């Protein structure tokens, strides 16, 4: 996907590490440093059955599987010397609800009422889902981040305050009151509205046992409290049509068993998750912002999450307050309900080394295949995948499923990546040389010769005198050849910038360059882009009206880097404007045309035919008329036409691998190493990321009894990678009997790897009589996945005094549990 300034629904990728040499050399490769990955080839092979995929890895038919194996098979896999298990603690299971009122006045959709949606939180047994359906591989979840996210410590007070517990009687009482007020009656235990049963249509994913079990569980609970339930079964392809592609008011669905795959890379300050999961403006809510459909609206959530996404805050505290407001309102609205954060066991052959278990993407991260190599000298790997193709691969409003994204990101590079264990921004193909800002309130002058695309005039115009911005980022794109052999240059940068401005601006009726999913998100970002200055072809200044307390986040939003040649983007633009295809799924559904997908041969043939027309017309886009000659354009058209003829698809990019072949009938996708000398990075460049430096709580010494109003002391011992280490942050939170956080703070270092928590009398006075819970998070500053200790402490009247300390040593004692 193109990485453009403020492209708000961007799929975050993993990051680039500084060069480090490695001793290992794949015997299939020359002994000199080579460009790109260690591997020569990776084949993605369809394996829908996880158990069969596991057996294939054991037998050597597959090298790894880019989907979790069954939880019940994980323990045996850990003890099998042929295998290595990688746990992924990202991704979640939940339900998406349809809040649209029915078109038929005699039909009642219960989920049009916020109170009924919210009541489902008490009808869902999250503990059962974790313990029985997930076999303990997960944790209960009510928010979009989860306990292992760096954001969780910022929102823990809000999340803990809800205190959801499985209570079907309480849920039924709420639901009964609302339905009765709406005119429904309960006849013999069944809800009736205007003579019709109150029916709920549940689309249950049957291509995954966990989602199917969870859907059946909720369907049964709904039946128990009087609803008629219509179960519908399908896979992601069906969900793309019925759930994400239909008009909500048609009520083709009312509940969908949804899985969120997590971010495509680990992100420290996640600017868009709250917006994607809760707010309409990013097109992730029912209706998808398609003007032809009924849409869920929430202006308050839009405003809050836009402030987070576009850094419209003046301090870290203000930003975190906004995040808490968004999460609180999102949970209260309950259009999207989170049920469980998964711990997914992924498996690879023990002979495969170098896989990088990114805290967001797991071993499916871009880094894994860039760094993977086999101990048997084989330069090719076979990777099983659950689905080979379940949605469009176009970079505008496609790449919405985890299966397509994980492969596409192997062949496409972006301007910035993310550290796989800290989530911090690191430059990749658009390294920055300077970040200038005067803070959140002061402005910088934008040079008069900085330019922006003017949609009305159809030309680049200068910013002129008097323009200003909060920040300036200077960056130097690392060009290479495209996979079709044509050299990247300034024209690709300009056209990528043009496209976002052209299609991100809606001038009103008659504007044809509008997409209902792309345009609303892009338009919000464009308000903050104040101009681009192309100083030289490889030195660009970007002026943006944003500020962040972490300057690297400013750079991430200001730099950009295209992931497809301008001629492919221009050809697709002409095809879409001709009404043959649409960029977004909802627009394709509305118009009854295809969802543009350049990996599909039929659509690639349309691109090829359009390129031939462009060649015959000697066409040069208006945005490039002063940059590209007719001869240069024709050279590009010929190269891309030749590529499509040879490969049968139009996926042309710039990454360390290129997409060689897509065989839908055979269920395979093949990517090969891009060994072009112009590629900027050598094999071994990412090897430092093979082993995260994780913190481990080795002991917690806490009083058995804490006297309210008296000081209390707790000792915590922490190791990193098996050694005592001071490069650790230890946070603690104490919740009372109602689940409200009443005490919080940071433990203080006392010796190497030893931390002390001293709670003063005025704080212990806030504890509830009886059991309270303390959660301790120990996080290595080099790997932001915490080790978590949860312990019950008893608060007693002051006269009782403190009991003798107990050293728990990371074992289950009483009500303590420790998560890793």
Task: Identify the function of each model-found stretch.
Residues 53-61, 107-119, 123, 444-448, ...:
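Aromatic- and charge-enriched surface segment that lines or borders ligand/interaction sites
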Residues 273, 346-391, 400-403, 658-669, ...:
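Long beta-strand-rich cores associated with HINT superfamily self-processing modules
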Residues 29-40, 72-73, 79, 110, ...:
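Surface-exposed, Gly/Pro/Thr- and Asp/Glu-enriched linker/hinge segments
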Residues 35-36, 46, 69-177, 192-196, ...:
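Local pocket/hinge segments that shape ligand/substrate recognition
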Residues 32-75, 228-230, 682-715:
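Ligand-site clamp/hinge motif
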Residues 54-69, 74, 78-83, 224-284, ...:
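Periplasmic binding protein-like
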Residues 112-224, 325, 371-373, 378-384, ...:
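Append "and occasionally in soluble cytosolic enzymes with long acidic Gly/Pro-rich linkers
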